[in-house]
């Protein structure tokens, strides 16, 4: 029987103190962290949940015994259809600032809480060379409108961010039977990518 791909990746994590940080865009990122947190606990890891807003409230209720950190993220807004491109471009300074802010905040958290590994669910700035850093996304190929050139540029930027991390976990299946379609399969996946199967809070 084939081993669960998520558990296979978790078995490769060195160190015991793991910080997991979901993006605060609704509850989707937080809910798909639930099976990851459960698998980490089963693997006898110490889990630190770093989030803000409703994701933090939700995960505190799901895992009341785990340590939590209020780790805020600056909201970025999408526009609609063609206006989405200009909306995203107008927010690039804010986007860049937020990545740098997260990056330096992570360094302080690592030293304060003795973190061995960080798992970031779509938070762009959480990589640090002194520890093992994992990025989770099902949307390798970011879609920001109907303009193929802009979508390709967004993919290349996202790929550059992803490759700052040691690993990229894609919550989908590779090849036939995948559910994310072009979001994860249109362009070549980053060299550090691993497909870990579908994630559900009911796993």
Cite the ranges covered by each PLM segment:
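A nucleotide-sugar donor-handling region in carbohydrate enzymes
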Residues: 2, 144-152, 158-203
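Gly/Ala-rich phosphate-binding loop of Rossmann-like dinucleotide-binding domains
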Residues: 37, 41
């Amino acid at each position: 029987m084939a081993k669960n791909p998520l558990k296979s990746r978790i078995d490769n994590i060195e160190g015991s103190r793991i910080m997991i940080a979901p993006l605060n865009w609704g509850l989707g990122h937080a809910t798909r962290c639930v099976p990851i947190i459960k698998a980490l606990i089963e693997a006898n890891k110490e889990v630190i949940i770093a989030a803000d807003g409703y994701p933090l409230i939700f995960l505190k209720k799901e895992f009341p015994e785990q340590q939590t950190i209020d780790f805020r993220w600056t909201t970025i807004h999408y526009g609609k259809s063609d206006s989405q491109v200009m909306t995203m471009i107008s927010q690039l300074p804010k986007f860049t600032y937020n990545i740098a802010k997260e990056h330096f905040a992570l360094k302080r958290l690592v030293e304060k809480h003795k973190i061995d590994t960080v798992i970031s669910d779509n938070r762009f700035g959480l990589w640090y060379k002194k520890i093992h850093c994992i990025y989770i996304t099902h949307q390798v190929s970011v879609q920001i409108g109907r303009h193929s050139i802009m979508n390709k540029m967004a993919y290349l930027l996202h790929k550059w961010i992803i490759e700052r991390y040691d690993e990229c976990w894609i919550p989908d299946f590779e090849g036939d039977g995948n559910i994310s379609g072009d979001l994860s399969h249109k362009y070549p996946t980053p060299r550090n990518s691993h497909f870990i199967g579908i994630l559900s809070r009911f796993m």
